[in-house]
């Protein structure tokens, strides 16, 4: 499908969970001849990341309202109005055929600006429970898509766009069949790490002994303390790294993952075809729990919520999964994934632009 001459504006910001899926769709459409610009904020990760991907970015001034004091709430209508006015001026100059909202505060005024100019608004919700901005914008959107069932009652489930190197991994039955020796446990707390996993997993390693080998991503500034915790637990042989640059290689190495359940993490693990033990971050709206639930229901994962998390709970769960069980779970994870999510979102953007 050629997009020669078509213009898209992507609205996404704040966290990797919003920005990376937006980049995947942007690159897919650019390969079809689309022009793409980005709407973001100057003080969040998109300001650096998006230009590195060869996409020009325009900035508006907006920040979140949750947890702010009374003064900020009183000033909010004026701030939103000003951000809407900035976004409207940017869109009048760029003249996009369609805008794609991938979440983050920037999508709110951006979506309203597009709607007020008669530009189609397409939304994608990455999480299992809809964010505040997308809940508002869904009322005026041309098309609403969701990664997991349940965020919106009637929206099409299209999955989350996932990195191509993860999608290119061999299927679980090719990758895991015939593996022997200690079970390979990949521990991932996200880029910031997860203190609870950093504290718990060295003790789990001590309980499981040589039945497992662990690769533990500790997050920024925690590598030394986590290495020390493994050593003090009598388990110095396990690998601890601050970051993992090549997640596809880490997934290829692993037999099972112990991790948080951010939207992209869950989608990547399903696409890779890996069993998982999820420890959702305790959001007020239990967002990460709802992200992980479809894989638990599919028999591909287990959820242990943080209040129930203990060394014994993790150790007993991992010890109870034989290699045969892990392979079955891995196959179920892959079967539950939506590997063509990027194409599905891109196709809806194209349709909205032609409508």
Swiss-Prot record:
Any single Gene Ontology cellular-component annotation: plasma membrane
E.C. numbers: 2.4.1.227
GO biological process, one term: cell wall organization
Protein name stated in the entry: UDP-N-acetylglucosamine--N-acetylmuramyl-(pentapeptide) pyrophosphoryl-undecaprenol N-acetylglucosamine transferase
Gene label: murG
Role: Cell wall formation. Catalyzes the transfer of a GlcNAc subunit on undecaprenyl-pyrophosphoryl-MurNAc-pentapeptide (lipid intermediate I) to form undecaprenyl-pyrophosphoryl-MurNAc-(pentapeptide)GlcNAc (lipid intermediate II).
Entry membrane topology: Peripheral membrane protein
Keywords of this entry: Cell cycle, Cell division, Cell inner membrane, Cell membrane, Cell shape, Cell wall biogenesis/degradation, Glycosyltransferase, Membrane, Peptidoglycan synthesis, Transferase
UniProt catalytic activity: di-trans,octa-cis-undecaprenyl diphospho-N-acetyl-alpha-D-muramoyl-L-alanyl-D-glutamyl-meso-2,6-diaminopimeloyl-D-alanyl-D-alanine + UDP-N-acetyl-alpha-D-glucosamine = di-trans,octa-cis-undecaprenyl diphospho-[N-acetyl-alpha-D-glucosaminyl-(1->4)]-N-acetyl-alpha-D-muramoyl-L-alanyl-D-glutamyl-meso-2,6-diaminopimeloyl-D-alanyl-D-alanine + UDP + H(+)
Statement: the UniProt record of this protein carries the keyword Transferase: yes
InterPro entries documented for this protein: GlcNAc_MurG (IPR006009), Glyco_trans_28_C (IPR007235), GlycoTrans_28_N (IPR004276)
Subcellular location: Cell inner membrane
Residue positions binding UDP-N-acetyl-alpha-D-glucosamine: 15-17, 127, 163, 191, 244, 263-268, 288
UniProt GO molecular function: UDP-N-acetyl-D-glucosamine:N-acetylmuramoyl-L-alanyl-D-glutamyl-meso-2,6-diaminopimelyl-D-alanyl-D-alanine-diphosphoundecaprenol 4-beta-N-acetylglucosaminlytransferase activity; undecaprenyldiphospho-muramoylpentapeptide beta-N-acetylglucosaminyltransferase activity
Family, as annotated: Belongs to the glycosyltransferase 28 family. MurG subfamily.
Organism ancestry: Bacteria, Pseudomonadati, Pseudomonadota, Gammaproteobacteria, Enterobacterales
